[in-house]
Design a protein with these regions (language model features):
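Active-site groove signature of glycoside hydrolases
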Residues: 158-182, 186-228
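C-terminal motif of bacterial Sec signal peptides marking the signal peptidase cleavage site
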Residues: 17-19
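Substrate-binding cleft/loops of secretory-pathway carbohydrate-active enzymes
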Residues: 207, 212-227, 234-236, 241-336
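Extracellular/luminal regions of secreted and cell-surface proteins that mediate adhesion/ECM remodeling
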Residues: 399-555
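Substrate-binding cleft of secreted/luminal carbohydrate-active enzymes
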Residues: 277-280, 288-410
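N-terminal substrate-binding region of glycoside hydrolase catalytic domains
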Residues: 28-181, 330-389
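Aromatic- and acidic-residue-enriched segments that line the glycan-binding/catalytic groove
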Residues: 134-167, 215-240, 291, 297
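Bacterial signal peptide processing site
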Residues: 21-23
Length: 555
């Protein structure tokens, strides 16, 4: 039997009240001590945190036969996929009747297959779409690297491939990012993807799509290898509508607004993230009027963990125009790290960089920049044929274990008290992870009798999303814990004699309106012992003796 309202929770610390003889009466509640499990001891899997299957690649170390010395990493709840526009829309829509349904205009099979397979493993998908990728095809038909449909080639430029490099002699087809035909057709693609997947709870995250190399909002490769740089810094404000310091941008502010509107309109109920290389795209997506249209604030998807900071140089370097001018977008992106997912990808080890300094930087940046998720690929030992050095493994494991939220809860010994028929105890929630949770999880308490039946229930008042410590230290290997306490009050009126436990849980309530596919997860795994079959954790006992007298038993 579940009776709501029989527990009460208020912020603050309960005061012990005087009983007979003026001595404090602790009452019937008694705290159960259960220390938090350190990140260096045990990984705690939960949705949207820790190591994820990047580009559907299995987790490390179990994906590498050379690493059998190390235990398998606990299963992830998340995987990512990027699909080329060419794969999604091979047929020119102008050759089809106007009333052609989406599933005939587009080939959704790669996405559908990934969603189905991941759901069978209790996982969700992070999805992105790209229109150009300089790396790393296994083969190039007709010696051409192209990620847009053939019918879109009039809105692109074909650059002859260099005789040396990663793809010698291969023609590179790069979209003209400001072409109205390109923007219109890509906007229609986004709208179709939204119609099909925005209400699908198997899709957890959609990456802002439509611009840059592999959808990462920069054109370094065309600038460096194809002789196609963006405008010079002193010309960029006029040419683009915003300042570009490194000649790695060619998209205009007007085109950015079109892509932002298309992405936001397509996925209002799905978490969006953005690769932060373009400051104007970040400015638009982090604006308050955009946030109001979405289910949550747009997150950040930086590349190159272990080599580059998760914050782009335009937001952090002392030489940056945006930093020197005190542009508000710098503050906005730094603050956003605290309130939205930060999904990272490791980077290939550069020449001249030692692996220890690489993994140390990765760990320090996970903690400092509130990284939520770390990729399963692209770090030096991922595909190594030799066993990973144990010291390096410890650094790698700590980076993955520290990423994201890591909550625990405990009742405070000695905080219990009783006033009349109401027993109270102070409860502390702590986040030991680098980031706070960003999805809709609801903490609460239940009073459970000796048979395991829930007899009383009430949500907690703590806001777990606020439990994150903002620390600018550049070399911290563990996040600074962030805690909040509240008092739980149990009304003993009408409670039958017996032994009870007060249990805490954090329940999954992340759902989309009118969902086409529903995802339900068990309560959050907390970094402590005692989880029962319902996902609850005992934090205190309550004993009501047979000779107890309450108003209900005096009648």
């Amino acid at each position: 039997v579940l009776r709501n309202g029989a527990l009460a929770v208020v912020a603050g610390t309960a005061l012990a009240l005087a009983g007979c003889g003026g001595h404090p009466d602790p009452g019937p509640l008694s705290a159960m001590v259960s220390p938090a499990i350190p990140p260096s001891v045990q990984e705690i899997p939960n949705p949207l945190r820790g190591q994820y299957e990047d580009l559907l690649n299995p987790l490390f170390p179990q994906a590498n036969p050379a690493q059998q010395r190390y235990p398998a990493w606990p299963a992830s709840y998340d995987a990512s996929l990027r699909v080329s526009w060419r794969q999604l829309q091979p047929t020119d829509p102008r050759t089809l009747p106007p009333d052609t349904p989406d599933d005939r205009k587009y080939d959704f099979s790669a996405i559908d297959d990934a969603l189905t397979k991941l759901a069978n493993r209790n996982m969700r998908l992070t999805l992105g779409v790209y229109a150009f990728s300089s790396c790393c095809g296994n083969s190039y038909p007709d010696s051409t690297n192209i990620a847009i449909p053939d019918w879109m080639r009039p809105a692109a430029t074909a650059y002859p491939g260099r005789p040396n490099g990663s793809a010698p002699g291969v023609t590179q087809v790069v979209p003209n990012w400001n072409d109205p035909g390109y923007l219109d057709a890509f906007g229609q693609l986004l709208a179709a993807l939204g119609r099909r997947y925005d209400a699908d709870e198997r899709l957890a995250v959609f990456e802002f799509s439509g611009y840059g190399d592999f959808g990462e909002n920069q054109i370094d490769y065309p600038r460096d290898a194809l002789g196609a740089p963006g405008p010079a810094p002193d010309e960029s404000a006029v040419a683009l509508g915003y300042y570009s310091q490194s000649r790695d941008q060619t998209i205009t502010a007007t085109s950015i607004r079109r892509l932002v509107e298309a992405n936001v309109a397509a996925f209002p109920h799905t978490q969006l993230v953005v690769a932060p290389q373009n400051p104007e795209i970040v400015r638009e997506l982090l604006a308050d009027d955009v946030t109001k249209k979405l289910s949550g604030p747009v997150g950040i998807h930086p590349d190159c963990l272990g080599v580059q900071s998760p914050l782009p140089s335009w937001a952090e370097s002392g030489d940056s125009h945006y930093v020197q001018s005190g542009d508000a977008v710098v503050t906005a992106i730094k603050q956003r790290l605290l309130s939205a997912p930060v999904i990272t990808q490791w980077c290939k080890l550069p020449g001249g960089t030692g692996p220890r300094s690489y993994y140390e930087k990765g760990l320090h940046d996970v903690v400092r920049y509130h990284v939520s998720m770390t990729s399963s690929i692209d770090f030096p030992d991922r595909d190594s044929t030799t066993e990973m050095d144990f010291g390096l493994y410890l650094l790698w494991a700590q980076a993955n274990s520290a990423a994201g939220y890591r909550y625990s809860v405990e009742a405070q010994p000695g905080s219990q008290s009783v006033r009349g028929s109401v027993a109270s105890i102070s409860v502390v929630w702590t986040n030991y992870g680098s980031a706070a949770m960003t999805e809709h999880w609801v903490p609460g308490y239940r009073l459970v009798d000796f048979t395991g039946a829930v007899v009383r229930s009430l949500p907690a008042t703590v806001d777990l999303k606020t439990l994150v410590h903002d620390d600018s230290s550049q070399s911290r290997e563990e996040a600074v814990p962030a805690s909040s306490s509240e008092s739980v009050h149990v009304d003993l009126t009408g409670l039958a004699p017996g032994h009870y436990t007060l249990r805490a849980s954090v329940d999954w309530q992340q759902h989309k309106p009118g969902a086409s596919h529903v995802v339900n997860y068990a309560p959050m795994a907390l970094a402590r012992d005692g989880r029962d079959g319902s996902g609850m954790y005992p934090i205190a006992t309550l004993d009501v003796p047979r000779d107890a007298t309450t108003p209900a038993h005096n009648r």
